[in-house]
């Protein structure tokens, strides 16, 4: 006779074990119709799963934009499998999980799928979903599940059972009419919930992400509760495609990638200009916030990486080389090198806090399938810093880091920032006392600045708690960039000490701090955020001066030289082309200011100024325009609408 407690505190008693759907029906048919699944004592369950004991229950409905939507998307992955097996009976199904904003299914199929094939598969999915068939869940023995997949020739499902499922488990098999899939669930009770979906694209993916395994075909899709949400999402995807940093990077001659150097960026003059301006900006912030800039070696002996503990955890991701019977690793991160710098010379508590920053050239052997333009690379530059401080200085130093993070992000126009605080995991180093003190210091630092944050219990690293900063761009996409991570482990492992007030040797607390993260990735984010319309201070070309006829050529050259001498990235366009053609071309290049010179402007010692967005700013005296654009650059104004 289970007693079910609902979110509003009300209780319902039942004579027999009861399912989420039964409870929903007891409340009303409308709720039952909208019921997708349940959350029993905080655990998600299928709507048909029986509750045998007293429990709290939350009914997951179509109004749930988190769990409810994730379940719908997962069920759409099964629906995709159902349609695929009908159209391609020889296809072997691998895995079909949900991802951010959608789902995918990996399949082994001899023929390569095209966009036209996806349209055919989607049409079959819609025809199946239209019938609103019931999804039947059956818990079976391990052997029954394996027999079912062996009879269907599903070798990947058999491998999952053999390697990932205990023989004592009772896997859940979900029956979609004649199609069977295996999953922990939960899933929708019927296909009436899977009506608003689309397939997006197909790509290659190695089985289990291992390049030694067979390359499968991965079909991506997305789904929503209603037609409008799906349409809005597809509109955002179209806009994201227009803003793709790889496409704009080529249009603006910023960078390129090539097969001979996978995951390594070839910066062109225009892109390197943006990169250097970012470095200059961050260097100013480092000075403002009291950092020393250092530079560590690119490569260090394996022995040091073993001492730091990175060899055990990162060896597969490290590029190595050898010389004179010694093995070296190219650094994947800067922190061990910074500890070596700290260790040179005796340090006193009076020397702390010591804030050490580096634009570190790092390399990680990322899987080739994970590489993505300059967003995910193998060679990158970290705007990395490490702060060595006493335990009593933690809160002040973390507060200083947070101020720097927000100060930096606001310059680029990022105001929507989500903050997460990750606390101690079960396996950790350091005393409970230092963890208590550190977690409280991080909380106090955030709360002193009125910053809302979400606590992620147990998600901290084994060596200390951390704060993560996630930016949301103009399309609502999340980019995790900044981190403030405490470390009680590395200084101790690498022998970092300072002399305390009582002449004792103490181990400093180390704070890892990143703001942009990887400069390459952050530039990719900026390209997509601005759609290539960089603020004037970042724009590779800040102004172009154009003549209407040959008569103004010398005047245009004179202005270009004056702007260049004033530190403005300007050039003269003296081509024998119509002025409208020149304006269109430089508009496509996203040059912030286009200066037009005809006879009238030349005689008056003026220039006609228009922006890349087509705004006519009128006529300026040359010196007045120099002051105007210098103010834009010096103040780092966004001026994205100009």
From Swiss-Prot:
InterPro entries: aa-tRNA-synt_IIb (IPR002314), aa-tRNA-synth_II (IPR006195), aa-tRNA-synth_II/BPL/LPL (IPR045864), Anticodon-bd (IPR004154), Anticodon-bd_dom_sf (IPR036621), Beta-grasp_dom_sf (IPR012675), TGS (IPR004095), TGS-like (IPR012676). Its EC number is 6.1.1.3. One of its GO terms (molecular function) is metal ion binding. Homodimer. The lineage of its organism: Bacteria, Pseudomonadati, Pseudomonadota, Gammaproteobacteria, Vibrionales. The gene is thrS. PROSITE patterns: AA_TRNA_LIGASE_II, TGS. Zn(2+) binds at residues 335, 386, 512. It comes from the Bacteria. Belongs to the class-II aminoacyl-tRNA synthetase family. It catalyses: tRNA(Thr) + L-threonine + ATP = L-threonyl-tRNA(Thr) + AMP + diphosphate + H(+). Signal peptide: none annotated. CDD domains: TGS_ThrRS, ThrRS_anticodon, ThrRS_core. It comes from Vibrio vulnificus (strain CMCP6). This is Threonine--tRNA ligase. Binds 1 zinc ion per subunit. Keywords: Aminoacyl-tRNA synthetase, ATP-binding, Cytoplasm, Ligase, Metal-binding, Nucleotide-binding, Protein biosynthesis, RNA-binding, tRNA-binding, Zinc.
